[in-house]
Design a protein with these regions (language model features):
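Subset of outer-membrane beta-barrel
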Residues: 3-253
């Protein structure tokens, strides 16, 4: 990667059916176990335990053996606080290593994982803050002559507010993600983490059956603004229709 471009990009893969159905707009409406990823301050919105798991083929049009897994849980501790966590695993599949002459040196598997612990605390009736601490590890090769494994740590901090601008239907969130030291695979070049500064708002409408969400995420290393817009409408308590839009200049989406 060129200097200044972020590494450890698997940390920026956004999980969850709800989020992906809403253009990944979640910062200002985070209220379930996926708040451990999108905005840890949103964990204070929980009134009971949440658990979720997802598994998906990743980039199936390019390779047939990449897989992404995300496991998350969250629970209220007391009336004013909550804890949670998630585990992320990205399997890049099997690859063949060759020398400069094209001779095969053997096959190897590449994978990455992250273990995250979350905590949220209410400041007052309408406001809360949250923090994530995470350890992540990446192994891009498992060969005796190749040093391509590294691990590091990072933190996220978030804020969530109900009754924003004195509107009982308006919520607001802010989050700084993947703040930590860069990573190096032993080649002397250090890649920064995919740090983002995000702001989101949510609007409850249609007597609480609908939610409109808008996120603005500034990618620090790419110096690009990502816009996420989503809407959901609950036909019944646990069944919703969702639509979303995302504009990512750096990813050309």
């Amino acid at each position: 990667m060129a200097q200044g471009e972020a590494g450890s990009l698997f940390l920026a893969i956004n999980p969850g059916a709800r989020a992906n159905g809403m253009g990944e707009a979640q910062i200002g409406i985070a209220n379930d176990a996926y708040a451990t990823y999108y905005n840890p301050a949103g964990l204070s919105n929980l009134s009971n335990k949440h658990f979720s798991f997802m598994h998906t083929s990743y980039l199936p049009n390019l390779v047939d053996d990449m897989a992404y897994d995300f496991l998350t849980f969250a629970m209220p501790l007391r009336e004013n606080s909550a804890i949670g966590g998630h585990f992320t695993y990205l399997n890049l599949g099997d690859q063949i290593s060759t020398d400069d002459n094209g001779n095969e040196l053997g096959s190897f598997s590449s994978y990455m994982y992250a273990l995250n612990v979350s905590y949220s605390q209410k400041v007052d009736e309408n406001s809360s803050w949250g923090v994530n601490g995470k350890y992540f590890y990446q192994e891009l090769a498992d060969l005796s002559n190749v040093d391509a494994a590294t691990g590091s740590v990072a933190v996220d901090v978030g804020y969530f507010r109900h009754n924003a601008m004195n509107n009982p239907n308006l919520t607001m969130g802010a989050v700084l993600t993947n703040l930590g030291p860069g990573v190096s695979f032993g080649d002397g070049e250090e890649d920064p983490l995919p740090t983002r500064l995000g702001f989101g708002v949510g609007l409850s409408m249609l007597e609480g059956a609908g939610n409109l969400a808008l996120d603005l995420n500034y990618e620090v290393n790419d110096q690009a603004m990502v816009t996420n817009l989503g809407f959901e409408y609950f036909l019944v308590e646990n069944f919703a229709l969702r639509a979303g839009f995302m504009n990512d200049p750096s990813g050309e989406l």
